Amino acid sequence: MATVTVTNLSANTRANIKKNDPVILNAGYEGDVGCILIGKVVGLKHKQSNTDWTSTLTVQPCADEILGKLINKTYVQNSKASAIVKDLLNIFGVEVSKCELTTDVSYPRGRVCRGNLKQVLTEIVVNECKSRFITRTTGQIYITKADDGIDNGLTLTPANGLLRADEEKVQLPVETDLNSQTTGEDRDEDTISRSCLLNYRVATAEVIKIQSADLNGRFIVVEGKHSGGRTSDWETTMELRPY
């Protein structure tokens, strides 16, 4: 789930927001705007403090709704994991931006797929094929090899928004549920904290080239968030590890 907080919407706008309304949240700057969230309203709260109104929307990303559906299907002997995964996604009309497995497991006795679609896919992709299963709040789904990231050629430098580092390395687990990343890895590594001016292109498992006075190289986003407000700067914070 994602939480969107907006201040001082008009009374008419507040009254018109309903559960199940579609939500598309764009962010960026003049001439460079992109989407960071697509979903629907599943929770809504308006609160008044003096003359200010705060509206808090709980938004279910569109991919989560589809992946929450139930499946009950049995696949024949010697079925391949890749074929099963593609078929499961096709049943519900899910488009996958990338689908590559570390190990394409074969099931000599066939395989029963029963339960929540996301749970079934996680069992196959992560537990059995030792791969990554990534869903993004924009609705994109990626299935990648364990060591692969999603490389769209993003480079961050001080000239295009990279902010000075204020923290040293901190110990965090590589495997994280934040931002809907699930990996087949079970290990801890040092991650590097960095931030930049809000950048809609930064997302879980994105490969980023960093060029700065104290850090140079290619890194993968382990987790992160976009945040800001009327009294603070709009920033994207990231936990990175070398790629």
Question: Where are the model-predicted features located?
Answer:
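Assembly/oligomerization scaffold segments
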Residues: 1-58, 230
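Short beta-strand-centered interaction patches in the first periplasmic/extracellular domains
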Residues: 52-63, 95-172
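Second-shell loop/turn segments in exported
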Residues: 69-78, 107-111
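An acidic/polar, Gly/Ser/Thr-rich interaction patch typically located in mid-to-C-terminal regions
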Residues: 1-14, 18, 147-148, 154-243
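Short solvent-exposed strand/turn elements
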Residues: 9, 52-68, 233-243
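Well-ordered beta-strand positions in beta-sheet-rich domains
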Residues: 35-40, 56, 72, 218-220, ...
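Glycine-rich, acidic and aromatic/proline-enriched surface loops and short helix-turn segments
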Residues: 81-97
